[in-house]
Regions:
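Short, acidic loop-to-helix structural element flanking the phosphoryl-transfer center
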Residues: 18-49, 55-62, 84, 144
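Short acidic-hydrophobic, aromatic-tinged amphipathic segments that line or gate anion-handling sites
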Residues: 139-143
């Protein structure tokens, strides 16, 4: 809760995290067309999913919606985004020396910058274009059906 002291925050998180892990599929589904775009991309690139959600929830959601992809959520000992550590861990796990980060928030743009990789900011998610431009976003994708094409264009630049 906003303005809460650290002890209250920890108490809330102690209740929330296990609840969310057990109920994370409620009102959650891939965006329309996303699975088809990932099918195109996985033919050419390894794919990993990195989230600040609890690791158990990320793995459960990925098992349901994105089976076969490496998934990493918040784990003890690995700093959360926007620190680059989770991105580096995912890149190592999938054997990627280069990467393009796909995100829908300012935190994602900053995470990619901290990791030294380009970020493709999608405009159907959490934040709007102005929010992401305010923190330096350069690449944008407006529709899920354009995702694979946008990734290939960025990949061709490095």
């Amino acid at each position: 809760p906003e303005g809460a002291d650290a002890e209250t925050v920890q108490k809330v998180l102690a209740v929330y995290k296990p609840y969310y892990t057990d109920h994370c599929q409620i009102k959650t589904a891939p965006y329309a067309g996303m699975l088809q775009q990932l099918d195109v991309l996985k033919e050419k690139y390894p794919i990993a999913i990195v989230s600040n959600k609890p690791d158990s929830a990320v793995k459960a959601l990925c098992a349901d919606f994105f089976p076969g992809y490496y998934a990493l959520g918040e784990v003890s000992g690995c700093p959360r985004k926007p620190a680059p550590d989770m991105v580096y861990k995912a890149m190592e796990a999938i054997g990627a020396e280069k990467a393009i980060y796909i995100g829908d928030s300012e935190v994602d743009v900053i995470t990619a910058r901290n990791a030294g990789i380009p970020c493709l900011s999608v405009l159907w998610g959490f934040r709007d274009k102005a929010d992401m431009e305010a923190v330096g976003a350069e690449y944008f994708c407006e529709k899920t059906e354009n995702l694979a094409t946008a990734i290939v264009k960025i990949a061709d630049t490095f």
